[in-house]
């Protein structure tokens, strides 16, 4: 095994000796001093009596061969027989060696020493670490300047928010610090850590891990062939909202990582259907039994089609009905209706085949209507339909700004806290349009702590509530933290989650059309509301009989 020898007492050689011993090199430290206490006093005269005693005791406990009272002659150094040799400046001068290399600290014959002009405690420790790297290279028979990596001061990529940091005066170093001065200087350290994503993301806070660690564990989870997939809960409870990407100075995208993991595990049969089963069946219900696609009476093709979204029909069917009536009355060229789900549920679940089938169904229905301009009442639907390439899609808020508020709309709604939807993240046009519409309603808007592109997810996105209800509740609590009064949103999922969280919650269409939805409906009531909206539209507008077809079986009660 390679051995090391260190000659002469100075702070640099003391630290090098500890560094080499820490690397498991059998190390001898030759000094002229007679004891560990005397050695520490020579190397670190700035220490107090108690400090010197403590360091001497620590030195005695190290796996280090201390040779006291040594005659530090050139003959001793040259005859030590060690593979790695490091010397103090005094011994370096006695050996008559040239100035050590500025990078590797190597002199002739591979002897390590600190260069001239290198003063101070920090520099001694820095040079000792560099000497340790050179020692490793020499022990391995490599060039000491090979593969050293970054050394010394570098520009950090770490982002640190200094908005809450309290600046303080530095303590002059002089000949060293007293314990009180050292404590005062150390107290100025703000413990630099970039936690921008964790500050905003309830999911990361729930699991208490940084994105890099989560990514590694998710990767390992996906790669498991047999055994328990312990990270499935974390993968499925990410809201896929994209807030972390906006908050991260480097744009790290946990949503894409979790969605890719879901897709991969679905494709390889490793993801249980159970966690998303009800949500997927709910999508199928919306696109079968509760589905409706019709042109406006009197038209075969339409200029527009209203797409309220599956949650609007489930949570606020009256607002959806009145919105359609208003659009029909004020838009030329015919306004069709399309009741159904945009398919984002299957997209979030990683069921890409089902998502493509949903897009194909919607595309075929839109073609029957003449590929009209889609009016979406949900920002997530708007985003999903646009990205799926299903045609021109605009938000109902944009049209209402063009047309003006409907007759009878309120103009003094009072104070509200406006929450931005995850589906509008990065969509400044929609965010601005909703605010302008709210102002026309007489709303005095208060912004929550996280707003616009940095808004918190309500807990509905990504099917988090189906996978981990407790994590979804964390999302909701975080979004409502510090918010008072009416919580105004333009996403029905947000409206529902905030109401379930105990807040007074309203969707902007409820205000515009004076159609408050009341308490959040349960699962069965949501399905009933979708069917009722479909039947009401068929009955009132298309004059069709909406009686339920008789069942082919008889129910007997016992």
Segments and roles (model prediction):
Residues 1-74, 208-389, 523-558:
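Iron-sulfur-cluster electron-transfer modules
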Residues 1-3, 46-58, 66, 82, ...:
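Ferredoxin-type iron-sulfur electron-transfer modules and their immediate structural context
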Residues 3-4, 111, 304, 413-416:
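Conserved hydrophobic helix-helix packing surfaces used for dimerization/oligomerization
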Residues 161-171, 199-218, 246-264, 351-352, ...:
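Iron-sulfur (Fe-S) cluster-binding segments and ferredoxin-like electron-carrier domains
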Residues 177-195, 227-241, 331-338, 363, ...:
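Immediate flanking context of iron-sulfur cluster ligation sites
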Residues 187-206, 236-251, 309-312, 338-350, ...:
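Local cysteine-cluster metal-coordination motifs and their immediate loop/turn environment
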Residues 392-412, 450-453, 502-538:
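Short, flexible loop segments at boundaries between secondary-structure elements
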Residues 444-449, 464-479, 504, 509, ...:
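Long, compositionally biased charged/polar accessory segments in the mid-to-C-terminal portions
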